[in-house]
C-alpha cells in the first residue's frame, strides 16, 4: 500500500496542482492521499473521478501531517531535490515489502520532515514539479507495471490511434433506464433484479468486479425486449454495442445462456459462429445466477438440471452442474445455500 501525504496545501492557491498530485497518485498506483489543509472542493473533485473512472482510491483533507508521517507504520519517503538519488534507493524500498508513505510538499518543506523521513529521495537534483517527481517515483517503484493495471468505472477509455473511444459501465439506475428505453416488461425487470441480487451476493464472495456483475446481470436479458428465442443473448449484445456499453458487459450478456454454448453447437442453433462459453468470473457468475431463476422464482440446481434433461439437453445440463460445482468451490459454499 502506498499513501501520499501532501503538506502545505493552500486551498485558494494550490487547488489545481494538488488536484494533479492526487490524480497522479491514483493513476500511478497509490491507494490514498492525505492533505494537511481541509479542502472539501478538492475531496469532491477526486471522489468524482474515482466514482466515474473506478478504483478504490481514497482522499482525506484536514489531517495533522506531522502525526500522520511520524506514526506511519511503514517506510516514510520525502521527495526532495536535496535527497539521495532515486535509483540508489528505490530497489531497497520496493524489496522491503512494507507500506510506503510519500511526503510531497507544496511550498518550503519544514526541516522536521527531513528528520522524520526514513528516506529523503531525489528524482533529480534540479528544480522539478512535484507532480512529475511523484509520477517518476511511483513508476520506478512499480517498475512500470502500474501502466498495465486496468480500472473499472462508469467511464472506460479504450486506446485508439485517433479520436476518443469511451465506453460506459452503467450503474443500476442507468441499466434500468436502458431496459425501459427498449420497452422491458415488469416481468423482465423483476427477473433481472432477482438475478442481480444473487449475482452480487456471489460476487462479494469472490474477487469479481461488482460493477461489471451488476451491469451484466441487470442487462443480460435486454435482448428479450426484441426476441424471445435463444438468439436474445446475441441481440442483447448488439443493442449494448450500439449504446456504447463496455465490451466486458457486452461479453457477459452474450455468454449468459445456460453454462455457455460452444461454436459448433452455436451454428446448429442458428447463432453466428462464435464461442459463447463464459470465461471470466463475472461471466460465469451472471450466467449461473440466471440459471437459478425462473422469472423471479429461485430454483435449486437439481430443478434446473431436471428441466434441461426433460428437454433432451443432457450436455447443457451437465455443463450447468459443472459450473455450479466450480462456483461453489470458489466461494466455499454450495450455491444453493445463498
UniProtKB/Swiss-Prot annotation:
Location relative to the cell: Cytoplasm
MF-aspect GO terms: tRNA (cytidine(56)-2'-O)-methyltransferase activity
Reaction equations catalysed: cytidine(56) in tRNA + S-adenosyl-L-methionine = 2'-O-methylcytidine(56) in tRNA + S-adenosyl-L-homocysteine + H(+)
Gene Ontology biological process terms in this record: tRNA nucleoside ribose methylation
Primary localization class, coarse: cytoplasm
InterPro entries, alphabetized: Alpha/beta_knot_MTases, HD/PDEase_dom, HD_domain, HDIG_dom, tRNA_m1G_MTases_N, tRNA_mtfrase_aTrm56
Cross-referenced SMART domains: HDc
Quaternary structure and interacting proteins, as annotated: Homodimer.
Record-stated family: Belongs to the aTrm56 family.
Name assigned to this protein: tRNA (cytidine(56)-2'-O)-methyltransferase
Lineage: Archaea, Methanobacteriati, Thermoplasmatota, Thermoplasmata, Thermoplasmatales
Amino acid at each position: 500500500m502506498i499513501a501520499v501525504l501532501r503538506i502545505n496545501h493552500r486551498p485558494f492557491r494550490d487547488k489545481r496542482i494538488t488536484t494533479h498530485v492526487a490524480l497522479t497518485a491514483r493513476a500511478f498506483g497509490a491507494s490514498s492521499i492525505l492533505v494537511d489543509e481541509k479542502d472539501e472542493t478538492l475531496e469532491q473533485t477526486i471522489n468524482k473521478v474515482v466514482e466515474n473512472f473506478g478504483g478504490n482510491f481514497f482522499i482525506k483533507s484536514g489531517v495533522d501531517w506531522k502525526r500522520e508521517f511520524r506514526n506511519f507504520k511503514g517506510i516514510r519517503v520525502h521527495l526532495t531535490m536535496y535527497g539521495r538519488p532515486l535509483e540508489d534507493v528505490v530497489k531497497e524500498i520496493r524489496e522491503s515489502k512494507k507500506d510506503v508513505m510519500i511526503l510531497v510538499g507544496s511550498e518550503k518543506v519544514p526541516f522536521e520532515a527531513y528528520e522524520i523521513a526514513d528516506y529523503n529521495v531525489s528524482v533529480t537534483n534540479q528544480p522539478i514539479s512535484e507532480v512529475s517527481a511523484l509520477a517518476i517515483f511511483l513508476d520506478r517503484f512499480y517498475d512500470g507495471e502500474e501502466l498495465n493495471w486496468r480500472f473499472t468505472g462508469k467511464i472506460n477509455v479504450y486506446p485508439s490511434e485517433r479520436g476518443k473511444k469511451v465506453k460506459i459501465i452503467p450503474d443500476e439506475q442507468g441499466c434500468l433506464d436502458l431496459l425501459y428505453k427498449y420497452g422491458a416488461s415488469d416481468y423482465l425487470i423483476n427477473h433481472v433484479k432477482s438475478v442481480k441480487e444473487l449475482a452480487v451476493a456471489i460476487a462479494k464472495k469472490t474477487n469479481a468486479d461488482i460493477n461489471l456483475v451488476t451491469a451484466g446481470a441487470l442487462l443480460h436479458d435486454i435482448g428479450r425486449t426484441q426476441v424471445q428465442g435463444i438468439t436474445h443473448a446475441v441481440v442483447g449484445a448488439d443493442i449494448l454495442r450500439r449504446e456504447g456499453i463496455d465490451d466486458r458487459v457486452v461479453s457477459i450478456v452474450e455468454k449468459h445462456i445456460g453454462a455457455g454454448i460452444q461454436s459448433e453447437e452455436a451454428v446448429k442453433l442458428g447463432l453466428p459462429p462464435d464461442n459463447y462459453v463464459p470465461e471470466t468470473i463475472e461471466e460465469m457468475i451472471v450466467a449461473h445466477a440466471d440459471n437459478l431463476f425462473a422469472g423471479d422464482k429461485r430454483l435449486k440446481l437439481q430443478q434446473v438440471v431436471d428441466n434441461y434433461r426433460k428437454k433432451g439437453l443432457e450436455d447443457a445440463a451437465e455443463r450447468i452442474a459443472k459450473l455450479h460445482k466450480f462456483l461453489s468451490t470458489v466461494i466455499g459454499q454450495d450455491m444453493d445455500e445463498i
